[in-house]
């Protein structure tokens, strides 16, 4: 496969298959959960995922994308959510998959969620950054966005950049450029690791646990017949952080980041990965 397999089509027709303006009815499939995932309105704007002791639930986009901007508003499980993981992510199939993650790790009542971000290329991740958010993500809906283009991946929360992962393939750092991905969301149990490394277990007396998603929106290069078809006016395709964006991101990281693989010298005693320097 060529390194760039996308087509830029300067046609309005391309936009009709490359931009999704958010209907859970039209654009996603609840692909597991046996009824625990539900769409709540005729317009397809609000969806819930639930978890009980028998099963969690999840949905996936109907289309695959090679590059795109995906965002959704989420309201997380309130109260004692220890052992639960609520997600919004991009992923390709297979054993050498690519993946871009937002994962929200639950906690006991009165303690903050951990927002876990990661990037996988060809099945290899280990690029974790984690944050404690500056608001209660269970009280109201907040907007989470992944922008993925050939130069970088940008994670934003309520429009504020919290992480930028650059394409450093020229330095030998893998970057997802070749495999189309679907968008996924899920609510599932991971009590063996999710909360304080597995020390806090899921309190099933609080089940069912429910998270809400609304205003799903994807602007992406849709994978069609082996090519990625992009609209002509995709500003996200060349998006980067300006000086103000960099300043805002560094401010969030200095105040709210609780783990950065680039700073973990015990994990990398021979030196941190090259993208960290």
Swiss-Prot record:
Binding-site residues, xyloglucan: 103, 116-118, 126-128, 192-193, 197, 267
Pfam families xrefs: Glyco_hydro_16, XET_C
Induction and repression of expression: By auxin.
GO molecular function: hydrolase activity, hydrolyzing O-glycosyl compounds; polysaccharide binding; xyloglucan:xyloglucosyl transferase activity
Class of the enzyme per the UniProt entry, highest EC level: transferase
Residues spanning the signal sequence: 1-21
PTM notes: Contains at least one intrachain disulfide bond essential for its enzymatic activity.
Active site: 99, 103
GH16 domain sequence ranges: 22-213
Reaction catalyzed: breaks a beta-(1->4) bond in the backbone of a xyloglucan and transfers the xyloglucanyl segment on to O-4 of the non-reducing terminal glucose residue of an acceptor, which can be a xyloglucan or an oligosaccharide of xyloglucan
Keywords, ordered alphabetically: Apoplast, Cell wall, Cell wall biogenesis/degradation, Disulfide bond, Glycoprotein, Glycosidase, Hydrolase, Secreted, Signal, Transferase
Family under the similarity heading: Belongs to the glycosyl hydrolase 16 family. XTH group 2 subfamily.
Protein name as annotated: Xyloglucan endotransglucosylase/hydrolase protein 19
Lineage: Eukaryota, Viridiplantae, Streptophyta, Embryophyta, Tracheophyta
GO cellular component terms, semicolon-separated: apoplast
Tissues and organs where the protein is expressed, per its UniProt entry: Root specific.
SUPFAM superfamilies given in the database record: Concanavalin A-like lectins/glucanases
Record note on pH: Optimum pH is 7.0.
Compartment list: Secreted, Cell wall; Secreted, Extracellular space, Apoplast
Function of the protein: Possesses xyloglucan endotransglucosylase (XET) activity in vitro. Does not possess xyloglucan endohydrolysis (XEH) activity. Cleaves and religates xyloglucan polymers, an essential constituent of the primary cell wall, and thereby participates in cell wall construction of growing tissues. Involved in cell proliferation in the tissue reunion process of wounded inflorescence stems. Maybe a downstream target of NAC071 as a consequence of auxin action in wounded stems.
Disulphides: 221-230, 262-276
EC number in record: 2.4.1.207
Name of encoding gene: XTH19
GO annotation terms (biological process): cell division; cell wall biogenesis; cell wall organization; cellular response to auxin stimulus; xyloglucan metabolic process
Signal found in the keyword field: yes
Site (Important for catalytic activity): 101
Keyword Signal in annotation: yes
């Amino acid at each position: 496969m060529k390194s760039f397999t996308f087509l830029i089509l300067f046609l309005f027709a391309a936009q009709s298959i490359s931009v999704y303006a958010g209907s859970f009815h039209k654009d996603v499939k609840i692909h597991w959960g046996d009824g625990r995932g539900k769409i709540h309105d005729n317009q397809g704007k609000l969806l819930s995922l639930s978890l009980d002791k028998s099963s969690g639930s999840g949905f996936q986009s109907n289309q695959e994308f090679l590059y795109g901007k995906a965002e959704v508003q989420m309201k997380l499980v309130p109260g004692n959510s220890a052992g639960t993981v609520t997600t919004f992510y991009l992923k390709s199939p297979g054993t050498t998959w690519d993946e871009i993650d937002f994962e929200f790790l639950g906690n006991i009542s009165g303690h903050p969620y951990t927002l876990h971000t990661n990037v996988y290329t060809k099945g290899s991740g280990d690029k974790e950054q984690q944050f404690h958010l500056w608001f209660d993500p269970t009280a109201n809906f907040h907007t989470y966005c992944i922008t993925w283009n050939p130069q970088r991946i940008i994670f934003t929360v309520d429009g504020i950049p919290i992480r930028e992962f650059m394409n450093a393939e020229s330095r030998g750092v893998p970057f997802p450029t070749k495999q189309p991905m679907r968008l996924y969301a899920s609510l599932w149990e991971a009590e063996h690791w999710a909360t304080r490394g597995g020390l806090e277990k899921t309190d099933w007396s609080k089940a069912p646990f429910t998270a809400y998603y609304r205003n799903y929106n994807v602007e992406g290069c849709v994978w069609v017949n082996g090519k990625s078809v992009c609209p002509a006016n995709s500003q996200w395709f060349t998006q980067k952080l300006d000086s103000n964006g960099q300043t805002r991101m560094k401010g969030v990281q200095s105040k709210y980041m609780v783990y950065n693989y680039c700073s973990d010298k015990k994990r990398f005693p021979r030196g941190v990965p090259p993208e960290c320097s």
